[in-house]
């Protein structure tokens, strides 16, 4: 049920912004289906789904700091927000580290270094 708890936490995080909530649910759904179809291990699938749910967590702090949701600002500010949330929900350190990396690079298409990254990018389109 950790995934449900994370989705609920992100719904709370984006309270008042239904388009962001709908987007994270869409990206999570696409990533989940693609990951299952690709035959990811249980651990890889969890990491992918967590990343898909929090991938845009940097939008809110980017708006607050820069009055913009530019992808580079999301990549700059998103990892710290993701780490804070995932620690609060007791995710393990290795998962948090990789998810923070993915959040910090999900608008950088020239550095794709794994299937989780590739699927996240594709699900986000």
PLM segments and residue spans:
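Active-site flanking loop/helix segments enriched in acidic
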Residues: 2-26, 58-68
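Short N-terminal amphipathic alpha-helix/helix-capping patch enriched in small hydrophobics
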Residues: 20-31, 44, 49
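Amphipathic alpha-helices of TPR/Sel1-like and other helical repeat/solenoid scaffolds
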Residues: 27-33, 78, 82
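Short, hydrophobic transmembrane alpha-helix segments
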Residues: 34-39
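Divalent metal-dependent catalytic cores for phosphoryl transfer on phosphate-bearing substrates
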Residues: 40-125
């Amino acid at each position: 049920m950790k995934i449900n708890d994370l989705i609920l936490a992100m719904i709370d995080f984006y309270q008042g912004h239904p388009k962001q909530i709908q987007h994270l649910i869409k990206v999570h759904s696409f990533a989940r289906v693609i990951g299952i179809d690709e035959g990811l291990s249980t651990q890889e699938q969890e990491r992918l789904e967590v990343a898909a749910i929090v991938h845009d967590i940097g939008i809110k702090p980017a708006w607050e700091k820069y009055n913009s949701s530019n992808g580079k600002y999301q990549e700059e500010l998103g990892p710290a927000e993701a780490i804070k949330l995932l620690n609060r929900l007791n995710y393990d350190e290795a998962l948090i580290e990789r998810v923070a990396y993915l959040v910090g690079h999900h608008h950088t298409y020239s550095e794709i270094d794994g299937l989780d990254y590739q699927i996240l990018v594709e699900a986000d389109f």
